Amino acid sequence: MTEDDNTRDPVTGEHLKEWGHRPGKQFGELLARANEMRAQGFGLVRIQAELASEIPDLPPVMDPHGPGAVAFHENIEAGDPDELDNIEKVRETMAALMRTPTLEAGAIMPDACPAGPVGTIPVGGVAAARNAIHPGMHSADICCSVMITDLGHADPKAVLDAAQSVTHFGPGGRPQGKRFTTSLKLLDAFRENRFLDNPKSLRMAQEHMGTQGDGNHFLFVGRSRKTGRTAIVTHHGSRGPGALLYKNGMALAERFRRELSPKTLKQNAWIPAESEEGRAYWEALQLIRKWTKANHNVIHQATVEAAGAEVGDRFWNEHNFVFRRGDLYFHGKGATPAWGEYAADASGLTLIPLNMAEPVLVARGKDAAHGLGFSPHGAGRNFSRSEHKRRLGSRTPEAQLKAETAGLDVRFHAGAVDVSELPSSYKQADKVVAQIKAYDLAEIEDYIDPYGCIMAGDLPPFWQTAKRGRR
């Protein structure tokens, strides 16, 4: 008689995990050996004992750093009570963030503002981790980025009209018949990655191509102050595919957190970069970056064709991402990489948009040590969207838009005026520019002065739209 009555039932991966084995390349060999023993009549208790020596030693638990043990650089200053209140909140959350045991350095940019519960990396925040990728520090909008294309002396209105006819704002993707082609090579690469090889990711990679989402994402048309040439600038991220990768990455990081550092804040959980899972996640990030770049490209190219414009230079940069320098992983949450070789396709120039009534800055980073090699990604906020709406009082969104953007062609593609995206909801642009210069974070080489822009607008909650669609 064997040690259990169900000796014909195979040993599965669930058995191995219950016994303490970690999923990985060795799983296949372990399962083969286990089931060979099973076929010989061994019971589960005996098989578990035979394989026990294969269980890797658990790494020691990592406790959070002590308060203030790891400092962070401040590249921001306050000039009024709102700015001071904002900086105090950013300092509080950064102090908690820097207790994460993998972190070795941090910095905040002139556009810094809180982005969640205390301890969450703020917008305009940078965190350098050793051998760790923190999904919560690149956020759900992975690879949120900006791209610019020089359109020569095309008429800005014609370009904005053309762009409005081809872009897509709002939730979800494009319907059949209105989709852009997604690279088959890229889709095949998705299928080879454990984080991206699922029906939902593959479907959204096709449906969301050529879409921009909502919130602060935009399509901007303006003229170069240096050359007088027309340019289009888009701002958006990786849409559904990136959001799903973030969700799966956070779930995996949480499992590691419980094992490696249960006292670390949940939002700061990490995936060990040198683990099999970490290498696969890093590769998934690079594939999402390629998808996001293609997403910008199709909108730009379709606009060029619809406007009949000539094409000059085109470049882009991300500002929600993870960058590797040596042994450290630099997490930028609303922070622009400001060193020349941050990526193989880096041009040396980056874009820093401010608000719909101000120019987009064309900058060359200074790789400042006190910025950990980053510069701002925009203007940032001193108070929340809801507080901004409260301060407007009885003024209508339409009246406020007219007052703040006189002479500009501002359009809301999929909804009413979103007052939380008006210039007054952001920090004063001139102060942000002054601090970029004062802290020597980047050299501003050009200004793309605004003609107009398109944004999603004030949309009803997604669940409300989905509910109406089911009726």
Where does each model-flagged region fall?
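Histidine-rich, glycine-flanked metal-binding segment
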Residues: 83-88, 96
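Domain-length cofactor-binding catalytic modules of enzymes
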Residues: 91-94, 101-108, 114-123, 131-139, ...
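Acidic, low-complexity central loop/insert segments
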Residues: 151-153
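Low-complexity, highly charged intrinsically disordered N-terminal segments
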Residues: 52-82
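Divalent metal-dependent hydrolysis catalytic cores, especially in the metallo-beta-lactamase
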Residues: 147
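Charged substrate- and nucleic-acid-binding regions of tRNA-handling and nucleotidyl-transfer enzymes
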Residues: 1-60
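Acidic low-complexity segments
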Residues: 66-73, 168-195
